[in-house]
Amino acid sequence: MLKYSISLILLSLLGFSAVAQNDSIASDSTRYAQKYGLRLGGDLSKIAKTVIDDDYTGFEINADYRFSKNLFIAGEIGTEEKTTSSTYLNATAKGSYFKGGIDYNMYKNWLNMENMIYAGFRVGASTFSQTINSYTIYTTNQNWPQATITDATKHSGLNAIWAELILGLKAELISNLYMGFNVQLKSRVTEKEPDNFENLFIPGFGRTYDSGRFGIGFGYNISYLVPIYKKNKKTPTEE
């Protein structure tokens, strides 16, 4: 419920910003300066989940750089550790990841506004380990109980590559400070698994959902734009 409330607040801020900016534009304006620079931030949802979920620890830094009016080069880097349980397996995944790609702003800003409603694409890569904390040996023989093995076994040198489609928004709260959220649809391309076990969780990708290729994720970000230079943008004069 909290994530939906935050999303509604961000949408309201975006709309309020548009109205306020429209009211402040002089009717004879013909050009304005667009900011170009590096925007750096972090994922608040991972920090919150670290605090409230005893089985999870994660941190992510994100950045984008404005390449043209609507096109941004973007990326994320982070670490995650997650303990996941299934019917017959309890395992802890721990590792780091990197995602790189582009974002395209579909929102038509008023003059010097810098808000975004965007679509993006990422290629992600992760290196991680899986520690098998316990597993149960399944048997159909009713005369023998199922055996649970609790000797932890660590499998290092695992990796995965995936692709992501992203939809999100970023609203400027005050000058150069942004709050935003995004939804990610993910598809695994390759992965290396432990012998005789499947990866239940991949850092950067998330849950694997019983060997399915697809996954989904979301993020709530706060970021700050470090302006490097500005470009003048012409706009038609209002009558």
Model-derived features with residue positions:
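Transmembrane beta-strands of outer-membrane beta-barrel proteins
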Residues: 38-42, 73-75, 98-100, 115-121, ...
